[in-house]
C-alpha cells in the first residue's frame, strides 16, 4: 500500500495501545510520480501519464484507478476502517483524482511555492481523497 510502504501491520500493532486520531498521506505512487514529473520537467498531464505507462507504473488500457483517485480512495477506506473499527466503504468517500490538472495549475502552485499532490486523509470520521496544495 502506498508504494509498498508497510502500514497495515504497524497500525494493528499500534492500535492495541494507542488511539490513532488521524491518517493522512500520499498513498498512490503513480499519481505522485506523475505530479512530480509535471513539476520537474514542465510536462502536461498526458505526457506524464505516457511516461508512467511506459515505465509500467500506470495501466496502459485504463489508468483511471490511479488518475481518478479510485486506488487512493480504496486505500484510505482500508486504513480508515482499521482506525474506526468498522467498515468504511469507498463509495462514501469524496474523491477527486488528478486527471484535470494542467500545466497552468502546476505553474500557479509553483508561484505560491507549493506543489499539488493527491492526499488521502481520515480525521474524526471525515474521510477524503482529493488533490491538495502543499507548501514546499
Label each residue range with its predicted role.
Residues 1-57, 63-71:
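Rossmann-like NAD(P)H-binding beta-loop-alpha module
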Residues 37, 47-136:
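Substrate-binding/catalytic subdomain of NAD(P)-dependent oxidoreductase enzymes
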Amino acid at each position: 500500500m502506498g508504494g509498498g510502504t508497510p502500514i497495515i501491520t504497524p497500525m494493528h500493532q499500534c492500535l492495541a495501545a494507542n488511539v490513532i486520531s488521524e491518517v493522512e498521506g500520499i498513498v498512490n505512487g503513480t499519481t505522485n510520480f506523475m505530479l512530480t514529473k509535471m513539476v520537474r520537467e514542465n510536462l502536461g498531464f498526458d505526457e506524464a501519464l505516457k511516461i508512467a505507462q511506459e515505465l509500467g507504473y500506470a495501466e496502459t488500457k485504463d489508468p483511471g484507478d490511479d488518475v481518478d483517485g479510485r486506488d487512493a480512495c480504496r486505500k484510505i477506506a482500508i486504513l480508515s476502517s482499521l482506525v474506526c473499527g468498522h467498515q468504511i466503504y469507498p463509495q462514501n468517500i469524496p474523491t477527486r483524482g488528478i486527471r484535470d490538472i494542467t500545466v497552468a495549475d502546476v505553474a500557479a502552485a509553483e508561484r505560491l511555492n507549493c506543489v499539488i499532490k493527491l492526499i488521502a486523509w481520515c480525521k474524526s470520521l471525515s474521510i477524503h481523497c482529493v488533490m491538495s496544495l502543499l507548501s514546499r
